[in-house]
Amino acid sequence: MRVARVVTPLVLVAHGSADPRSAANARAIGREVARLRPGLDVRVAFCEHNSPGLVDVLRDCPDRAVVAPLLLANAYHARVDIPSQIAGCGAADRVLQADVLGEDDRLVSVLRQRVTELRVSRRDNRIGVLVVAIGSSDPVANAHTAGVAPRLLAGTRWAAATTAFATHPEPSLAESVQRLRHMGARRVVIAPWFLAPGRIPDRVERFARDAGLAMAAPLGAHRLVAETVLARFDRAAGARIAA
């Protein structure tokens, strides 16, 4: 008799936003994850603002599940918000939380591609790249995020790269642009370390427009973003099996 293989659901949880483009991007990533892994039960949930909520999705999961945060930084939402929602619906004993996407090499590669989509050559040594992230109240999380900029230069001849945080007053975006110019950049472009469009990326885009700078697209529902989600899922699911 053939025994049916139990497939652990992957619950892809995004923070959620009042901007519908953010939720649309999360769902697009969910579809790409499902396309890359046929047969995997992929469900999309949100911490707030959008539906379905994480608690509702977990209550509908028949058994075990892996919650994969669609987050770049290991900060409040990953360490407090999501775990509390898992515990609050009584699912802590059957749900594993995967690691955040973080500063994965695949995502840095996508960011580099987004910059080149601005018709920026990897061999152009005049280029300075300002990586703009949301920022966190956690300095450790910000330090990890700041590591993206120097890694972005790998395989290029770009003059320099540095990081600024959209929610932090210092250094300001304008100050960071000047820093790149002092580092030898003659043309500065902005690389948004965001998964999706939204109100904060729009604010950065307004700055770029006013400053006469080109700004790349967010990471979006790129195949490598979905691959990173699956890598986090596989690691969490594998840890459960090993245990």
Predicted feature locations:
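Active-site-proximal alpha-helix that buttresses catalytic centers in soluble enzyme cores
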Residues: 1-243
